[in-house]
Amino acid sequence: MKDNIVIITGITASGKSELCDNLIKKHKNISIINCDSKQVYKEIPVITAQPPKQKEFYRLYGYVSARENYSVGLWLEDLKREVNNALKNSRIPIITGGSGLYISSLIKGLSSIPQISQEVRENVNELRKNLSKEEFYKLVLSKDPRIQGKIFINDSHRLSRALEVITETGKTIFVWQENRQPPLFNNFKVYTILPKREDIYRKINSRFIEMVENGAIDEVKNLLSMNPSPHLPAMKAHGVPEIIRYLKGEITLDEAIQIAQTNTRHYAKRQYTWFKNQFPNSQVIDCANKLTEFGIF
């Protein structure tokens, strides 16, 4: 695609949604297209901080069932359709979100990792739950020595993914990542929002309390009433596992809030490192509102 496409990414709670609201007020010829792997799920709009549904401007938010094992490959198909529709209607596509795999697949192309079987996923998940962090890391390292220095002990999601891939395929995940399909776009601008850490951490803490006050607990209750598999992506959205533990009586509400805040801050910390290393051609902004002060198109 030869048309300019804008990608706005960055740390969780960095102000991407507020920025998009401001851009809509300033520019009427834009389409905001979601690039967050959890904001696609229609049953959890509060706990995933989805924007209000203004169909005129927002696309790919809250349109997938939490029962679905939605993937980056499916998202790329949906994204291509929405970008084409925007360009056809003389709108500027603004793709925004902070999911690392989605962003990487968008900019660098989708890796050709085969589908992982449900049996392998469940076995890896059981290992992750039953082993300590140190034991799980040593296990994955013994299966795939190439993770050393690339995937770290606290990154349980990437460790699980690495173990799934080498168990399913017999090849390290890095071999598959080195063989990618061509990216969808060849002409885009990338902006990465990286505010000060203390500002992000403060926003994470206050935002989760607001989510609880605005119905996140009822949202998770409704999610559980669907009896979804615990391995589905929607069940792993930030705050969902902690609220489930509260609803089961395992922890108090205050404990659930504190644990969710801590886990989300740890996630943001990993995002800082990831974004700084992944996209050297990106324009880094320390405050989202700065993007409304100069032309991003």
Curated annotation (Swiss-Prot):
Belongs to the IPP transferase family. Substrate binds at residues 12-17. It comes from the Bacteria. Keywords: ATP-binding, Magnesium, Nucleotide-binding, Transferase, tRNA processing. Pfam families: IPPT. The record marks 99, 121 as: Interaction with substrate tRNA. It catalyses: adenosine(37) in tRNA + dimethylallyl diphosphate = N(6)-dimethylallyladenosine(37) in tRNA + diphosphate. It comes from Wolbachia pipientis subsp. Culex pipiens (strain wPip). ATP binds at residues 10-17. Its EC number is 2.5.1.75. Monomer. GO terms for molecular function: ATP binding; tRNA dimethylallyltransferase activity. One of its GO terms (biological process) is tRNA modification. InterPro entries: Dimethylallyltransferase (IPR039657), IPT (IPR018022), P-loop_NTPase (IPR027417). Signal peptide: none annotated. This is tRNA dimethylallyltransferase.
